[in-house]
From Swiss-Prot:
The lineage of its organism: Viruses, Riboviria, Orthornavirae, Pisuviricota, Pisoniviricetes. It is found in: Virion membrane; Host Golgi apparatus membrane. This is Membrane protein. The gene is M. Component of the viral envelope that plays a central role in virus morphogenesis and assembly via its interactions with other viral proteins. It comes from Human coronavirus 229E (HCoV-229E). Belongs to the alphacoronaviruses M protein family. Residues 32-40, 96-225 are intravirion. Keywords: Glycoprotein, Host Golgi apparatus, Host membrane, Membrane, Transmembrane, Transmembrane helix, Viral envelope protein, Viral matrix protein, Virion. Residues 1-10, 62-74 are virion surface.
Amino acid sequence: MSNDNCTGDIVTHLKNWNFGWNVILTIFIVILQFGHYKYSRLFYGLKMLVLWLLWPLVLALSIFDTWANWDSNWAFVAFSFFMAVSTLVMWVMYFANSFRLFRRARTFWAWNPEVNAITVTTVLGQTYYQPIQQAPTGITVTLLSGVLYVDGHRLASGVQVHNLPEYMTVAVPSTTIIYSRVGRSVNSQNSTGWVFYVRVKHGDFSAVSSPMSNMTENERLLHFF
């Protein structure tokens, strides 16, 4: 009889909460699937909020489980303590790497938990940032009728062939990688063509050049922090 009552309670609980969990999980699916900056800034902001809240939420739950099971279930205490320490370490690592990346690139993309590297392109006095997963060996820049694309992603319009930079940079938490222009095939008449950049050096450099500086482009890119 006790087992029947337990089963009945579980079925009743599922009936009462099934619709609510269905709605919550559907919202999570929409946020995770369409939470990209180019699709919807609202969903992207919600996605970042969920990711940022997961660390303190899991940490709080782990600490509570450790306290609740203290002196009654040491297996749960050990597991909860391990989860709390692991979450705290990952949280600290996130802030440390994000700060190091922000120190180089000076963009809010550095605080995105999904971003490991940022491509920095300066054209016509404007700096453009592109989040990527890892630093590439080479970067391909395409110019189609004055529209600038970096590895297939549109960055700017109204760009002429002579406006293309001599250098590009990619910032990662541990270093800044500088890419130099090594080859190109362009048509100046219709502002169409491609330019290829390869990495030439890396170090503790700023990934962002300052358009207000009187230094040359080369000097701006290579100045130390």
